[in-house]
Amino acid sequence: MAGSEGLMSVDYEVSGRVQGVFFRKYTQSEAKRLGLVGWVRNTSHGTVQGQAQGPAARVRELQEWLRKIGSPQSRISRAEFTNEKEIAALEHTDFQIRK
């Protein structure tokens, strides 16, 4: 899947107006378009968090999307990325919305 490019994993948390604006659905669609796996969910403190895995360049594309674009009605104030690392194999089989 990755060719000569390594796989990477990153955890993310996005703050701002990101709940009640279909942010999870749009994140799932964008991740699938990029061929990534992982998950996304709302938190009890009004943010959206998740994990994305796949070819490094594609994960970086999703990071930019999470920082600057999001869903049409969202207003992103901050996107934080943690636990960014190279991985030997994907740990998920799909990109899911978690409740």
UniProtKB/Swiss-Prot annotation:
Tissues expressed in: Organ-common type isozyme is found in many different tissues.
Keyword Hydrolase found: yes
EC numbers: 3.6.1.7
Record carries keyword rRNA-binding: no
Catalytic activity: an acyl phosphate + H2O = a carboxylate + phosphate + H(+)
Active site: R24, N42
N-acetylalanine PTM sites in chain numbering: A2
Protein name (Swiss-Prot/TrEMBL): Acylphosphatase-1
Origin species: Gallus gallus (Chicken)
Lineage: Eukaryota, Metazoa, Chordata, Craniata, Vertebrata
Gene giving rise to this polypeptide: ACYP1
